[in-house]
């Protein structure tokens, strides 16, 4: 049956900012869906408030609204755009929950908008725990003993009957938000009370724990004619009890018998048919390792994290096919774009093993509980493809960028055996390495299996890796041993470390023995049909399937897994670079290993190498492809950190040279350059030892800002206030960047400003200047940023332009550059320079209409900006305002400090755009979860250093009609100032917070980072109970200003296309 005749315009709901549990996989699927609908001749309208994604570029959808996906806003867009249908199953939980609300509030019926794909009833059945259980029982599919509760009493009653442990799963949430495993009444009360608050409908499922059973997933697809296929089976390395997003996942399943596989495959098809899901769906099972007994854990009636993994694992474009099914096409009417011959009505076959490993943010949060369970904590993930599980696993490990090139880690090696055994007894981010070390120490596999419940098949594979390590260690590196090690997935660096030699020695020996990788294609059909797309992975000892053509081509190095400090902004830049190369008539090659992103879609570049981004892997591809050169400026710190090794091996870097990159990344060299250029910088010096640091501190006095070299996201950057804090810091920083200088600056309490520019070495174009709401000292990625800057004098603006031009020319920048400044009392200081794409490139490109990445690619290929129609200086500023707001995932990270500082903590960002500044800021606050009601109760607990700012703040709050509560010390100070507020103890404040008594909390930390401190507990409680929390006086002042001045009904709801037209007219008039 052809597509629906009455659907011509479709509204797609995006998933919003990157948060733990809802990351780039939804941008990938949403982008694919928009392209898929446009292929069918439909007009696509998109709503998504995430500026960092390629999805919100006007190249992807026809009309783009960067607005908050709320019922109120989306109703206005529906009224304005009059879509025929709405597609919500590709926007993660955000899209699904919004669709449910629009349907329940009668908005879809009011405007005659059809819910496309999976029906409202099917969504309700899959998402509502009670209805889902009933449906499974109807069709004879087993579900664990459980009860849906709306209060704590019913949960306790169930526990009394069935005993512990129990698993708690809130309804309509993602990433296991608010869930957990309870082992006693106290834990049950705590988890259930939180879960009820996190659930959109105030209900949670309490079920008997199946902890230790195998967790198996099936990705299934169904069309409206009831045609069904299973796309991929996946097996979690970790047993039930660890969220699948925090588990190592392998595809296809490795330890199931054919009977077990067919049993679960049949159940999957039965379930998707019973739920009448139209499109893709993910089904999770718990399988008893001792029998054929299984239970259905849950169904996601939408494209999910696992769908993105299954898509990349098989090459089957799930989101693309799901979008076409949503508009009425059947599976046998949709062409498989990978083979170009078969239809989408076939089940992919894999002749390789895929391994996904999560990337956790614990390098940013040292105080956080590193245990993993039912609530997801990973920010991103990597995927590897190889011919065996061992090789696939080792490839994935070295893709993580955690300084692991195999399963041997020095800090684990140094542990006592009892510490290792403790480490394997509880799921945590390091357990894989603890198990390998236990095997090295001859701990019995049966014992490890008993403790971890990880299948012995996997443990024996880990033992194979450990035995190979022993073989390498004991023998000469003969051709036979080196071949065997490479076939098993060992990196040159790991082999070198085991043998105590250099990586280049292993590389040279490998070449002497003619041991080179072979490259294979992912074709969805185990080579049964020829593939027309170029989706490639490496292996050893097999036939090479990849032909090399002598044509102009360029390699773009991607940014790897999503982590704090390096998010999808860099994937946006990589994708734009691939498109710019295509427009320039040059074949583009991307190297990346992130299954969630658009850059690793099979048709984004001309050729995709799904490989680790390490020196060895990149050099192998470079030597095979022989391109014009390599672009490192779009892959964040991942790509930048490879530059030195690439240049030493004769690789041509396109864009800014390695020498210039090194000057800007090395704190000592950079400081000298600024002195030569006569550019202001904070007073400071660089230290290599604790003694150096003490001497500098004596000269500069506290507070100081300290940071290592060659890191991203302000990793390990801190403001220190005492000598002891400084000494502790230096010891830690020398581990982060060994042998590299630590910069110690006098802290400047000024406004922070940043620019992104494009330079060709002579001409420097600055699209705009962004001003941060928070003072210097809060990481730029965690600051609210305003464009155009509002509080700079003409003289300060001219100085910023002049400094940017001087630095860009001195470094001979050919491409993008990002510079951060502090401005205090009319003096402009340069804080930092990054000669690469930064996380603000996507938002500045969207705000100003300047195609920054395209220009950077053209410049790197040798063009001049003047030839491209641009001149030096500041681009005309827009007549509208854009505000970037950070978005945090703190509620998922137990014991993480939530207050702002120099080290970045946000996982994503949203954008507020409006014709007025207050309107843009109000939208940004709302999108970031910091919306303050017009009236209500506000709690203040302020650090002494900020006391002088409190009286004016309280007067403002009282004038706006808020009822003020303060903790003892803050209240006492206000009383001395003659200001009366309600005073309560910190302990009582925390209790009232849990009861939902306060509408917002303003708390500036005294020390921070100590989970035992009451202030720390106060901040954590606010975050966990979703009460707006402000830890910076600057943010709350700006927020109150917006609340006081904004007329919510007067906010402009315009598409980015309309804003672009406003700016085009503005530029035209100014140029004339």
Swiss-Prot record:
Entry's cofactor comment:
Binds 4 Mg(2+) or Mn(2+) ions per subunit.
Please list the GO biological process terms of this entry.
'de novo' UMP biosynthetic process; glutamine metabolic process; L-arginine biosynthetic process
Residues reported to bind Mg(2+) 1: 284, 298
Renumbered residue ranges of the record's region Carbamoyl phosphate synthetic domain: 545-929
Binding-site list for Mg(2+) 4: 832, 834
Positions bound to Mn(2+) 4: 832, 834
Q: Which HAMAP family does the record match to this protein?
A: CPSase_L_chain_A, CPSase_L_chain_B
The name this protein carries in UniProt is Carbamoyl phosphate synthase large chain
Q: Which PROSITE patterns is this protein grouped with?
A: ATP_GRASP, CPSASE_1, CPSASE_2, MGS
Q: Identify the stretch(es) annotated as Carboxyphosphate synthetic domain.
A: 1-401
UniProt-annotated binding residues for Mg(2+) 3: 820, 832
Q: Where is this region: Oligomerization domain?
A: 402-544
Specify where the region named Allosteric domain lies, as residue ranges.
930-1072
Question: What is catalysed by this protein?
Answer: hydrogencarbonate + L-glutamine + 2 ATP + H2O = carbamoyl phosphate + L-glutamate + 2 ADP + phosphate + 2 H(+)
What GO CC terms are in its UniProt record? cytoplasm
Originating organism: Thermoanaerobacter sp. (strain X514)
Enzyme Commission identifier(s): 6.3.4.16, 6.3.5.5
Chain positions recorded as Mn(2+) 1 binding sites: 284, 298
Tell me which UniProt keywords the record has, alphabetically: Amino-acid biosynthesis, Arginine biosynthesis, ATP-binding, Ligase, Magnesium, Manganese, Metal-binding, Nucleotide-binding, Pyrimidine biosynthesis, Repeat
Q: Name one GO molecular function term.
A: metal ion binding
Amino-acid positions noted as binding Mn(2+) 3 in the UniProt annotation, renumbered to this chain: 820, 832
Q: What does this protein do?
A: Large subunit of the glutamine-dependent carbamoyl phosphate synthetase (CPSase). CPSase catalyzes the formation of carbamoyl phosphate from the ammonia moiety of glutamine, carbonate, and phosphate donated by ATP, constituting the first step of 2 biosynthetic pathways, one leading to arginine and/or urea and the other to pyrimidine nucleotides.
């Amino acid at each position: 049956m052809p597509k629906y005749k009455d659907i011509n315009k479709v509204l797609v709901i995006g998933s919003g900012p990157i948060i733990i549990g809802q990351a780039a996989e939804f941008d990938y699927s949403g982008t694919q869906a928009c392209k898929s609908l446009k292929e069918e001749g439909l007009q696509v309208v998109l709503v998504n408030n995430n500026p960092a994604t390629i999805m919100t570029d006007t190249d992807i959808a026809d009309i783009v609204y960067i607005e908050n996906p709320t019922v109120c806003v989306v109703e206005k867009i529906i009224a304005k755009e009059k879509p025929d249908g709405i597609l919500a199953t590709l926007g993660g939980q955000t899209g699904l929950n919004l669709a449910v609300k629009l349907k329940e509030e009668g908005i879809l019926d009011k405007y005659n908008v059809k819910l496309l794909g999976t029906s409202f009833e099917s969504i309700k059945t899959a998402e509502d725990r009670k209805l889902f259980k009933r449906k499974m029982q109807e069709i004879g599919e087993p579900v664990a003993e459980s009860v849906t509760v709306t209060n704590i009493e019913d949960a306790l009653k169930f526990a009394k009957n069935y005993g512990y442990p129990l698993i708690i799963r809130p309804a309509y949430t993602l990433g296991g938000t608010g869930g957990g495993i309870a082992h006693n009444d106290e834990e049950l009360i705590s988890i259930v009370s939180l879960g009820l608050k996190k659930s959109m409908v105030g209900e949670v499922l309490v079920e008997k724990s199946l902890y230790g059973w195998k967790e198996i997933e099936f990705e299934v697809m169904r069309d409206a004619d009831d045609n069904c296929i299973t796309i991929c089976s996946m097996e979690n390395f970790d047993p039930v009890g660890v969220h699948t997003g925090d588990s190592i996942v392998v595809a296809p399943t490795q330890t199931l018998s054919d009977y077990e596989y067919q049993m679960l495959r049949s159940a999957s098809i039965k379930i998707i048919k019973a739920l009448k899901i139209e499109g893709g769906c993910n089904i999770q099972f718990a399988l008893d390792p001792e029998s054929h007994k299984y239970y259905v854990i849950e169904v996601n009636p939408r494209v999910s994290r696992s769908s993105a993994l299954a898509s990349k694992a098989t090459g089957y474009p799930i989101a693309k096919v799901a979008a076409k099914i949503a508009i009425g096409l059947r599976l046998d009417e949709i062409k498989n774009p990978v083979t170009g011959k078969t239809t989408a009505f076939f089940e992919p076959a894999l002749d390789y093993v895929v391994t996904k490993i999560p990337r956790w943010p614990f390098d940013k949060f040292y105080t956080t509980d590193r245990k993993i369970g039912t609530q997801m904590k990973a920010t991103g993930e990597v995927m590897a493809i190889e011919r065996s599980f061992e090789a696939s696993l080792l490839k994935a490990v070295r893709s993580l960028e955690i300084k692991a090139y195999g399963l041997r880690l020095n800090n684990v090696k140094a542990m006592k055996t009892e510490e290792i055994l403790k480490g394997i007894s509880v799921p945590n981010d390091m357990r894989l390495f603890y198990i390998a070390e236990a095997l090295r120490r001859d701990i019995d596999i049966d014992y490890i299996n008993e403790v971890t419940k990880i299948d012995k098949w996997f443990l024996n594979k880990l033992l194979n890796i450990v035995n190979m390590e022993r073989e390498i260690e004991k023998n000469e590196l003969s051709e036979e041993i080196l071949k065997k090690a490479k076939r098993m997935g060992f990196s040159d660096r790991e082999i070198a470390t085991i043998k105590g030699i250099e990586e280049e020695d292993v590389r040279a020996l490998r070449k002497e023995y003619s041991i080179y990788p072979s490259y294979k294609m992912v074709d969805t059909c185990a080579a049964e049909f020829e593939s027309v797309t170029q989706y490639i992975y490496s292996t050893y000892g097999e036939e090479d399937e990849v032909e090399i053509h002598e044509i102009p081509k360029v390699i773009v190095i991607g940014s790897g897994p999503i982590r704090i400090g390096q998010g999808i902004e860099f994937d946006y830049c990589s994708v734009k670079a691939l498109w710019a190369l295509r427009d320039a008539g040059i074949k583009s090659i991307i190297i990346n290993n992130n299954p969630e992103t658009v850059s690793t879609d099979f048709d984004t570049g001309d050729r995709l190498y799904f490989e680790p981004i390490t020196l060895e892997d990149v050099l192998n591809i470079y030597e095979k492809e022989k391109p014009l050169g390599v672009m490192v400026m779009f892959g964040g710190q991942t790509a930048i950190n490879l530059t030195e090794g690439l240049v030493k091996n004769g690789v041509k870097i396109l864009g800014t040279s390695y020498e210039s990159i090194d000057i800007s990344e090395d704190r000592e060299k950079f400081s000298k350059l600024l002195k030569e250029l006569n550019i202001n910088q904070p007073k400071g010096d660089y230290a290599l030892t604790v003694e150096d640091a003490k001497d500098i501190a004596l000269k500069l006095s506290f507070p100081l800002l300290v940071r290592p070299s060659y890191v991203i996201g302000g990793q390990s950057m801190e403001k220190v206030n005492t000598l002891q804090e400084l000494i502790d810091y230096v010891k830690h920083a020398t581990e982060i960047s060994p042998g590299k200088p630590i910069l110690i600056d006098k802290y400047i309490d000024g406004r922070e400003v940043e620019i992104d520019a494009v330079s060709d070495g002579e001409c420097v174009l600055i699209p705009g200047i962004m001003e941060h709401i928070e003072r210097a000292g809060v990481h730029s990625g965690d600051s609210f940023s305003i464009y155009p800057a509002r509080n700079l004098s003409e003289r300060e603006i001219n100085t910023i332009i002049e400094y940017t031009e001087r630095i860009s020319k001195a470094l001979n920048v050919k491409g993008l550059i990002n510079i951060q400044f502090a401005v205090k009392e009319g003096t402009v200081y340069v804080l930092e320079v990054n000669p690469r794409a930064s996380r603000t490139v996507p938002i500045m490109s969207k705000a100003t209409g300047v195609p920054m990445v395209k220009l950077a690619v053209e410049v790197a290929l040798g063009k001049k900006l003047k030839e491209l129609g641009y001149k030096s200086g500041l681009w005309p500023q827009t007549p509208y305002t854009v505000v970037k707001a950070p978005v945090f995932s703190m509620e998922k990270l137990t014991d993480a400090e939530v207050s702002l500082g120099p080290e970045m903590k946000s996982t994503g960002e949203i954008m507020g755009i409006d014709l007025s500044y207050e309107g843009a800021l109000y939208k940004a606050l709302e999108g970031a979860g910091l919306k303050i009601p017009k009236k209500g109760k506000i709690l203040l607990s302020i650090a002494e250093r900020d006391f002088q700012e409190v009286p004016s703040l309280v007067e403002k709050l009282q004038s706006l009609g808020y009822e003020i509560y303060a903790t003892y010390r803050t209240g006492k100070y206000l009383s001395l100032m003659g200001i009366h507020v309600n005073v309560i103890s910190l302990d009582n404040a925390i209790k009232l917070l849990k009861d939902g008594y306060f509408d917002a909390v303003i708390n500036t930390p005294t020390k921070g980072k100590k989970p035992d401190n009451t202030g720390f507990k106060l901040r954590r409680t606010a975050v966990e109970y979703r009460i707006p929390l402000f830890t910076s006086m600057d943010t709350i002042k700006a927020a109150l200003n917006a609340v006081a001045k904004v007329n919510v009904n007067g906010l402009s709801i315009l598409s980015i296309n309309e804003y672009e037209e406003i700016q085009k007219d503005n530029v035209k008039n100014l140029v004339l």
